[in-house]
């Protein structure tokens, strides 16, 4: 697959992440979801003069190649193909016991949305895939074409917060096999009432696609697992920063930050400015939450 080395993607809440995550300029920081390297580069730039270093990980081998290209000029960055739920394994291999900051951006990267054949976007006609880790077996095609109707409906309702989940699940089952993203969009369109198709602020397929993507990549399970162990890998005073894009993730993060005795929340969540949303519309639903290791 051809990869476009895009040096102009826009990281979400970039300044807010850098200003709040970096408290020790000579420290060790981990970007747990490197993507195309925007946050990683900004962190590396800030800590480089002080001898600070950045460990970057991502589960997507294709997007990691783009990050490698974009970060060539930063000698204080090391990149690895790992999932953030595998962080303890990587830190053990690197003989790093604790770090000073952890960042997780739970959004989909620009590359993943636009790259041919990945199946993340409803704006293109592609095979139903949606895997962030291309080595995983579970795809959107498998979910759409094999899951029982009730299970599909629950996923669309719980992960997509879609009120018409039962109607959509029934339509999916009735129209199997569904091969491509465009076919799935048409099925969703026919399942929804007219006003839901034409009057929603976002595209009518957004919630269903989000739900399927979350199921494919086990996103809720992964962030829950990560939050269980992450505080143990932070030095005292270390920062944990999580960017979420929908209320289900944010509720989990908020609950842990409030109730985990190892952590102290830093203020309330941070939202993008009106200017940032105008420049980068996909930032509109982002929330940054921060906590400090006690």
From Swiss-Prot:
GO terms for biological process: rRNA base methylation. This is Ribosomal RNA small subunit methyltransferase H. It comes from the Bacteria. Its EC number is 2.1.1.199. The keyword Transferase applies. Disulfide bonds: none annotated. InterPro entries: RsmH (IPR002903), SAM-dep_MeTrfase_MraW_recog (IPR023397), SAM-dependent_MTases_sf (IPR029063). Specifically methylates the N4 position of cytidine in position 1402 (C1402) of 16S rRNA. It is an enzyme of class 2 (transferase). Gene3D superfamilies: Putative methyltransferase TM0872, insert domain (1.10.150.170), Vaccinia Virus protein VP39 (3.40.50.150). It is found in: Cytoplasm. The gene is rsmH. It comes from Fervidobacterium nodosum (strain ATCC 35602 / DSM 5306 / Rt17-B1). GO terms for molecular function: rRNA (cytosine-N4-)-methyltransferase activity. GO terms for cellular component: cytoplasm. Keywords: Cytoplasm, Methyltransferase, rRNA processing, S-adenosyl-L-methionine, Transferase. It catalyses: cytidine(1402) in 16S rRNA + S-adenosyl-L-methionine = N(4)-methylcytidine(1402) in 16S rRNA + S-adenosyl-L-homocysteine + H(+). Transmembrane segments: none annotated. S-adenosyl-L-methionine binds at residues 37-39, 58, 93, 105, 112. Belongs to the methyltransferase superfamily. RsmH family. Its main location: cytoplasm.
């Amino acid at each position: 697959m051809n990869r476009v080395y895009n040096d102009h993607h826009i990281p979400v809440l970039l300044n807010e992440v850098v200003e709040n995550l970096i408290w020790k300029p000579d420290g060790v920081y981990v970007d747990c979801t490197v993507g195309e390297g925007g946050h990683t580069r900004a962190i590396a730039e800030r800590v480089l003069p002080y001898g600070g270093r950045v460990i970057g990980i991502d589960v997507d081998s294709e997007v990691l190649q783009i990050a490698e290209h974009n970060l060539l000029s930063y000698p204080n960055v090391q990149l690895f193909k790992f999932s953030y739920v595998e962080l303890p394994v990587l830190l053990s291999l690197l003989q790093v016991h604790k770090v000073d900051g952890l960042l997780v951006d739970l959004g989909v990267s620009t590359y993943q949305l636009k790259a041919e054949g990945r199946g993340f976007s409803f704006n293109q006609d592609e095979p139903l895939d949606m895997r962030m880790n291309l080595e995983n077996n579970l795809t959107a095609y498998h979910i759409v074409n094999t899951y029982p109707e009730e299970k599909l409906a629950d996923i669309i309702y719980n992960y997509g917060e879609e009120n018409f989940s039962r109607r959509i699940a029934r339509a999916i089952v009735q129209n199997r096999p569904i091969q491509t993203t465009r076919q799935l969009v048409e099925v969703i369109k026919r399942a929804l009432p007219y006003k839901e198709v034409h009057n929603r602020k976002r595209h009518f397929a957004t919630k269903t696609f989000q739900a399927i993507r979350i199921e494919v990549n086990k996103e809720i399970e992964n962030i829950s697992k990560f939050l269980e162990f992450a505080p143990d890998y932070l030095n005292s005073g270390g920062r944990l920063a999580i960017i979420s894009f929908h209320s289900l993730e944010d509720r989990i993060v908020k609950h842990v930050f409030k109730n985990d005795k190892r952590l102290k929340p830093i203020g309330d969540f941070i939202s993008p400015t009106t200017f940032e949303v105008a420049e980068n519309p996909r930032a509109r639903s982002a929330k940054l939450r921060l906590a400090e290791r006690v």
